[in-house]
């Protein structure tokens, strides 16, 4: 293969790697911990941290999955 062909192949592979969307299961979890369980009926508000806005985390409390602001401990 010529050097031009190799450069084209490398460029296409790089572009594919940049444009391929990263699924939420491959992303690291957001920092912090979930606060204590709220006292409310079952609700499924989120599936993972990345379905929550900003710094909020998707916190699972049994039958409750909801976006909550994280708490940080030292």
Swiss-Prot record:
Damages membranes of susceptible bacteria. Has no hemolytic activity. Not toxic to mice. Does not inhibit the proteinases elastase and cathepsin G. It holds the Pfam family WAP. One of its GO terms (biological process) is venom-mediated disruption of cell wall in another organism. It is found in: Secreted. PROSITE patterns: WAP. Residues 1-24 form the signal peptide. Residues 27-71 form the WAP domain. Keywords: Antibiotic, Antimicrobial, Disulfide bond, Secreted, Signal. Expressed by the venom gland. Belongs to the venom waprin family. This is Auswaprin-a. Its main location: secreted. Disulfide bonds join 34-59, 42-63, 46-58, 52-67. GO terms for cellular component: extracellular region; extracellular space. One of its GO terms (molecular function) is serine-type endopeptidase inhibitor activity. Coiled coil: none annotated. Gene3D superfamilies: Elafin-like.
């Amino acid at each position: 293969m010529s050097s031009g062909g190799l450069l084209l192949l490398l460029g296409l592979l790089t572009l594919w790697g940049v444009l391929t969307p990263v699924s939420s299961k491959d992303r690291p979890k957001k920092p912090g911990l979930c606060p204590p369980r709220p006292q409310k009926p079952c609700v499924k508000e989120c599936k993972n941290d990345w379905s929550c806005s900003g710094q909020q985390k998707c916190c699972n409390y049994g039958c409750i999955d909801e976006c909550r602001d994280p708490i940080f401990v030292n």
